[in-house]
């Protein structure tokens, strides 16, 4: 488990009314760490935020946490279950 994954999981859980419906999956693709954030359909808007500002902030924090570990991190936010 990476620091970037931990950051995304904690923050996304705090943003939703149902943190137990948040799932984070981490995988490696072509030298990049891909973090997929799955949230329940009704909670996606809270994680994305107005004009995507919350999503952009989550991506920036995940990238910064990954950079500390020498990794390139990409965050994708998805509706539903993994």
What are these regions (language model features)?
Residues 1-46, 56-82:
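RNA-contacting regions in translation and RNA-metabolism proteins
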Residues 48-52:
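Glycine-centered tight-turn and secondary-structure capping sites
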């Amino acid at each position: 488990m990476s620091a970037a994954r931990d950051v995304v999981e904690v923050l996304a859980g705090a943003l939703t009314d149902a943190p137990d419906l948040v799932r984070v999956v981490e995988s490696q693709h072509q030298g990049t760490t891909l973090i997929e954030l799955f949230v329940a359909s009704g909670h996606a808007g809270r994680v994305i935020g107005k004009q995507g500002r919350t999503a952009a902030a989550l991506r920036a924090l995940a990238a910064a946490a990954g950079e500390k570990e020498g990794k390139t991190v990409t965050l994708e936010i998805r509706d539903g279950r993994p």
